[in-house]
Amino acid sequence: MALAPSKVSTFSGFSPKPSVGGAQKNPTCSVSLSFLNEKLGSRNLRVCASTVPLTGVIFEPFEEVKKSELAVPTAPQVSLARQNYADECESAINEQINVEYNASYVYHSLFAYFDRDNVALKGFAKFFKESSEEEREHAEKLMKYQNTRGGRVVLHAIKNVPSEFEHVEKGDALYAMELALSLEKLVNEKLLNVHSVADRNNDPQMADFIESEFLSEQVESIKKISEYVAQLRRVGKGHGVWHFDQRLLD
């Protein structure tokens, strides 16, 4: 269908064509256009708009907020912000807080070991101190999220960790890094469990929080420490450990 430029009329105003008998019917036709069809000849196109008002109410906020699940609590110990936050999700977040704090505690013990004067691997000490701080930040981030959703933070006990990390066959550097790799995989497993709890309780906000704030970073940490383990296995327990330690200081 081709438009014929010479046949197209200009807008003729907004006066609709009256119906038979002079009474205007709905819909109102306000614009008339002409176009040329090669087979059918000249045709008119009329643009119409209905004048029938909308009578149905789409949204009544003052009625909707009367639902019981939207009622604002009055008890002093009840969260005002909590909505669609299952008890299982709240418990899972508290458990993950404990996991992160325990991981931080292990890394802090490793930092103290490598910082000793008779071990003196400052690069390893720096790496494990930063790892400890990172896990603690993760715990604090989870605590903040718990409060955001209207849950209550419950801190569980932190287990005692060893203070000696010497290993006869592997040496302390490789042994400590393999321990760190196992720990990162364990934390990742726990995070995936928290994500499954969110899915099971149909909580997309919590699932998105775990995905965006933790999971990607966790697999990157696993990859990095895996490379450290592979490199330490190559250098052995001797002079190569010192060179690797210097690299961690950079």
Curated annotation (Swiss-Prot):
GO biological process: intracellular iron ion homeostasis; iron ion transport
Gene3D superfamilies: 1.20.1260.10
EC number(s) given by UniProt: 1.16.3.1
Organism whose genome encodes this protein: Malus baccata var. xiaojinensis
Similarity annotation: Belongs to the ferritin family.
Transit peptide: 1-49
Protein name listed in UniProt: Ferritin, chloroplastic
Source organism, top-level taxon: Eukaryota
Enzyme class: oxidoreductase
